[in-house]
Amino acid sequence: MTNMRKSHPLFKIINHSFIDLPTPSSISSWWNFGSLLGICLVLQILTGLFLAMHYTSDTMTAFSSVTHICRDVNYGWLIRYMHANGASMFFICLFLHVGRGIYYGSYMFTETWNIGIILLFAVMATAFMGYVLPWGQMSFWGATVITNLLSAIPYIGTMLVEWIWGGFSVDKATLTRFFAFHFILPFIITALAMVHLLFLHETGSNNPSGLDPNADKIPFHPYYTIKDTLGVLIFITVMLVLVLFSPDLLGDPDNYTPANPLNTPPHIKPEWYFLFAYAILRSIPNKLGGVMALVLSILILMLFPLLHTSKQRSLMFRPITQTLFWILVVDLLILTWIGGQPVEHPFIIIGQLASILYFSIILIFMPISGLIENKILKI
C-alpha cells in the first residue's frame, strides 16, 4: 500500500497534498479553517443537491416548494436548515480564514492570496443568488435592490440590469437563471479551491512567527489530520446547536412572507454576512460612488501584498500594527451592526465614519505603522 500511495498517479497527488505534505511544526489552530472551509463546501453541495431534487424555480411555486421540503420531505426541514445555516458557518470560517491571512502575513503568497479573494467573490455571489431562491419578501426585494445597483454603471447600466433580470423587473426568468447559476457555481468554487491548494503547496504553509519554516517541518498525517479533526468536531457541534435549537436566528422573518412586488418591506437588508459591505455602500450618498466603494471593500484585500512595508511578515512581533488590526476587526463589527439599522440619524454618520476608518486603516495607517516599526527595530 505504501508503494501504491507513492507511485499511483492519482494516489500520489492525494499523498503529496494530505499525507506526506511537509508542514511547519508551529502552525496553530488558526490554520484549521482551510479544512473547515472544505467541509463547508462539501456539506453545502450535498445538502443543496437534495434540496434541488424537490425545489422548483418558478415564481408561482418556489415559495410553496420550500414549504413542501420542510413539511412533507423526510428530514427536509433538517436539510433546508443545514443548508441555510451552513452558509452562515461558511462565511464565519471564511472571515476568520482571511483575518488569519492578514494577521500572519499569509498574503505574501500572492497567487494563493489572489485566488482566495476570487473564491471569496464567488462564494458571495453564490450566497446572494441562493438567498433569492426561497422567493420570500426579502429574497425578492434583496434581488431587486442589489441587481439594480448595476444601473449605476455609465452608458450600459440599465441595459445590463435588464439583461440580468431577463425582462423589465425581477421575475420568473431571473429566478430560473439564479437557480442555474447557484447550482453550477459551487463546482467552479471547488475547482478554484483546488487551484488555491496547488499554489499553496508550491510555497508551503506560512506559520505564526512569519519566519522561514523549512528548518522544522513534520508530515501532515497524522499530526495535522488529528488536529483538524478536533476543529471539525467543534464545527459540527456549533452547527448542530444552531440548526437544531435556533435555525432562524441568523435569518430574516420577512422571508417567511411570499414575495409581493406591490408591497415593499420597511427595511430591506441582505443576510448578516453582507451587512458590512452594505453599510459601506449606504454610507456614500452617490449611487455610482456607493457601488464602487462596495466592490473596493473586498477588492482592497488584493492590495495587501503591495502595501506591506514591514521587514517582518507576521504581526506577532509588531504591537502597533497589531493594535490597528484589532481596531479594524471592531470597525467591521460596527459596520455589520450599522448595515442592519435603518437609514436615519445617528446610524448614517456612524456608518460613514466607520467606512472612512476601514479604508484609512488598510490604505494609510497599516503601511505607516510598518515603517515606524522598521525604525524601532534599529534602535
Swiss-Prot record:
GO terms for cellular component: mitochondrial inner membrane; respiratory chain complex III. Its cofactor is heme b. Coiled coil: none annotated. One of its GO terms (biological process) is mitochondrial electron transport, ubiquinol to cytochrome c. It is a multi-pass membrane protein. Heme b b566 binds at H97, H196. This is Cytochrome b.
